[in-house]
């Protein structure tokens, strides 16, 4: 693996999440192909793409910004999960189990992304300079 992001466990987990989201998207009715199904796929894919983009050649502050975008994309995917559940698009026991698993995985991934953001936040904090202080 030649890129920094390829070594990140959180990125690897986000790929698994995206894969599972694609599986759910395939279960949705044809009428949702270009709406909810597409939205779920794009949101889930955006999680790993932003982790990757932010990790390569960026400052900690910039990487933190991309992780924030990644986290918001994950939340968007979770909102899609709620819509899928509310519309009863996953109605068999196996499909319900897959949807519940995707939700749990989102919780775990969100915690990992936030932990990474917190670790970066500590490295970008700089002391405030008081330019008007007397020497």
Feature names for model-found ranges:
Residues 1-53, 57-135:
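Short, C-terminally biased terminal segments at protein or domain edges
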């Amino acid at each position: 693996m030649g890129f920094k992001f390829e070594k990140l466990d959180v990125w690897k987990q986000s790929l698994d999440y995206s894969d599972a989201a694609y599986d759910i998207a395939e279960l949705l009715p044809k009428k949702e192909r270009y709406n909810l199904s597409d939205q779920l796929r794009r949101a889930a894919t955006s999680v790993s793409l932003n982790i990757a983009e932010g990790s390569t050649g960026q400052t900690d502050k910039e990487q933190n910004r991309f992780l924030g975008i990644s986290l918001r994309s994950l939340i968007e995917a979770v909102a899609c999960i709620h819509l899928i559940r509310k519309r009863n698009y996953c109605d068999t026991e196996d499909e319900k189990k897959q949807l519940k698993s995707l939700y749990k995985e989102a919780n775990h991934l969100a915690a990992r992304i936030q932990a990474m953001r917190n670790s970066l936040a500590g490295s970008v904090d700089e002391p405030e300079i008081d330019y008007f202080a007397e020497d």
